[in-house]
Amino acid sequence: FKFLYGLDQSIQEMIFRWSKQNLIKDLEHVRDGENEYIDVRGKISNHELTEPINLIGLIDSKKGTIRANHYHPQQEQKCLFTEGQVIEIFQDILNLNAPKITQVVSKGQLSIIKPNVAHTMVFTKDTTFLNLVRGEREHDNYGITHTIKHVFVDEKEKNMLLSNYKFECR
């Protein structure tokens, strides 16, 4: 066995390539599909994924329910919404003074959640989305490796969001 490149050369090449990428630094952001193709049959909407994905979860959630209240220490999570609508609440857990931030994600949009960002979803409609991740997601490891519980939106706050959230001014 022979290495084709030295470690120094490989690291320099990685740094060069990564420094040329236009990275989004937001904790969590939402993107619409791009490069749409529309004809009489319907619409094709494209979402570019910037890293490999090895697991896709299909998640159905009922109107008025809450999911998440956790963070991922290492994984970036992508959620592609195929039906419904959700209020996402998120917070940077590495910054003790970080505020809670809300945003609305609707059908056809992709939500990208960075590592170490606590997030909760409050469903305003019956919703279906694809959960796209890289890494392991064994149910037995919940709370140990990939997903750490972090309750920061309770039932009272969920109900307040559902009854008072102003979608028109966003």
Where are these regions (language model features)?
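Histidine-centered metal-chelating micro-motifs
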Residues: 66-68, 108-120, 137-138
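Short acidic-glycine-tyrosine-enriched beta hairpin
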Residues: 93-115
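His/acidic/aromatic-lined binding-pocket segments of jelly-roll/cupin-type domains
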Residues: 70, 76-81, 103, 111, ...
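Double-stranded beta-helix
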Residues: 97, 103, 118-170
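Conserved short histidine dyad/triad with adjacent acidic residue
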Residues: 57-74
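Short hydrophobic/aromatic-rich beta-strand segments that constitute the beta-sheet cores
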Residues: 46, 88-90, 131
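Glycine- and acidic-residue-biased ligand/ion/polar-headgroup-sensing regions
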Residues: 74-93
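A short, N-terminal "cap"/entry segment at the start of jelly-roll beta-barrel domains
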Residues: 1-54, 68, 164-169
